[in-house]
């Protein structure tokens, strides 16, 4: 999500907030048809009611290293989140319909892994929680913002964001390569990470997790790196 930083959020409410944030390279601004939007919504519903039981767990990607887009630094690390007032920020700049629909499915107190992406060593660095459910993403209306979408209207906004709050750092960094090793092994054995969205839909910057996936990843904190 782009902008130099995700800034502090306001109090809960339906009105649009003047906040800024960052996105990952995996999110691309796109003028997608209504058909694609509806398809993504159907896929989100399938995740919730069909194949995957979403429970209340997510993985959310952001870039910890500086990268300029239209003169704006896209960097937003977990340390940046910790530095925000109340360690809380909006998660703006998502421009993928399925990822947006996942944001809209989030509920208060849902838990999410903070995942550093598009960097030298990608992986899970910490935990955060949802402290405000989906509301219009202000950056879609800001002409100077890389996430500006001229096709979106204030009375019918296309894009949403949520507010997240830092919970804690992981007891140890869980790198992508370690997760990939487990994913490959679990595909053969039927283990918890056999269908993890991180590997089946890699480009999504907001991803659902089953409780089984979430609990298994948490358990890795207590083990030595594989």
Curated annotation (Swiss-Prot):
Residues 14-28 have a biased composition (Basic and acidic residues). Pfam families: EVE (PF01878). Specifically binds 5-hydroxymethylcytosine (5hmC), suggesting that it acts as a specific reader of 5hmC. It comes from the Eukaryota. A motif (Nuclear localization signal) lies at residues 5-10. SUPFAM superfamilies: PUA domain-like. Residues 1-38 are annotated as: Disordered. It comes from Mus musculus (Mouse). It is found in: Nucleus. Phosphorylated. The keyword Nucleus applies. The keyword Phosphoprotein applies. This is Thymocyte nuclear protein 1. Expressed in the medulla containing mature thymocytes, but not the cortex having immature thymocytes (at protein level). Abundant expression seen in testis, liver, brain and kidney with lower levels of the expression in thymus, spleen, heart and stomach. Induction: Down-regulated upon induction of apoptosis. PANTHER family: THYMOCYTE NUCLEAR PROTEIN 1. InterPro entries: 5hmC_binding, EVE_domain, PUA-like_sf, THYN1-like_EVE. One of its GO terms (cellular component) is nucleus. Keywords: Nucleus, Phosphoprotein. Residues 29-38 have a biased composition (Polar residues).
């Amino acid at each position: 999500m782009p902008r130099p930083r995700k800034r502090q959020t306001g109090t809960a409410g339906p009105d649009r907030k003047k906040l800024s944030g960052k996105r990952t390279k995996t999110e691309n601004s796109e003028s997608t048809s209504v058909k694609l939007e509806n398809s993504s919504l159907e896929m989100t519903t399938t995740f919730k009611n069909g194949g995957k039981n979403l429970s209340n767990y997510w993985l959310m990607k952001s870039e910890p290293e500086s990268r300029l887009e239209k003169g704006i630094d896209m960097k937003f690390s977990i340390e940046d989140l910790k530095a925000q007032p109340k360690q809380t920020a909006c998660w703006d700049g998502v421009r993928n319909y399925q990822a947006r629909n996942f944001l809209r499915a989030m509920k208060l107190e849902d838990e999410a892994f903070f995942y550093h992406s598009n960097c030298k060593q990608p992986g899970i660095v910490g935990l955060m929680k949802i402290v405000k459910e989906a509301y219009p993403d202000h950056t879609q209306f800001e002409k100077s913002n890389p996430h500006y979408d001229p096709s979106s209207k204030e009375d019918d906004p296309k894009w949403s964001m949520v507010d997240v709050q830092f919970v804690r750092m992981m007891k140890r960094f869980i790198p992508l390569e370690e997760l990939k090793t487990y994913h490959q092994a679990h595909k053969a054995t039927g283990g918890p990470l056999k269908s993890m969205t991180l590997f089946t839909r890699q480009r999504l910057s907001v991803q659902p997790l089953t409780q089984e996936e979430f609990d298994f990843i948490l358990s890795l904190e207590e083990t030595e790196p594989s």
